[in-house]
Amino acid sequence: MTDLKITLIRSAAHSLPEQRKTVKALGLGRVNSTVVLPDNAATRGALLKIAHLISVEEINK
C-alpha cells in the first residue's frame, strides 16, 4: 500500500472557490504545508483539481 505526500507549492488565494475548498479539505493550509494521505480514487480526484498548486510524491509503507 502506498501513501501520497502532498505539498502545497503555490497559494490558493487567487484560485477558484472550488479549488480553495479542495485545498482546505485535503488539510493543506499555508504554502509549503505537507500532508500524507492514502492513495485512493477520492484523493487522486481531488489532486487532479489542484494539480497546478501542489507537488505529489509516492511513499511506500
UniProtKB/Swiss-Prot annotation:
Highest taxon of source: Bacteria
InterPro entries: Ribo_uL30_ferredoxin-like_sf, Ribosomal_uL30_bac-type, Ribosomal_uL30_ferredoxin-like
GO biological process, one term: translation
Keyword field: Ribonucleoprotein, Ribosomal protein
A molecular function GO annotation: structural constituent of ribosome
Gene3D superfamilies found in the cross-reference section: Ribosomal protein L30, ferredoxin-like fold domain
Cellular component terms per the entry's GO annotation: large ribosomal subunit
Family to which this protein belongs: Belongs to the universal ribosomal protein uL30 family.
Assembly mode: Part of the 50S ribosomal subunit.
Name of the protein this chain belongs to: Large ribosomal subunit protein uL30
Gene expressing this chain: rpmD
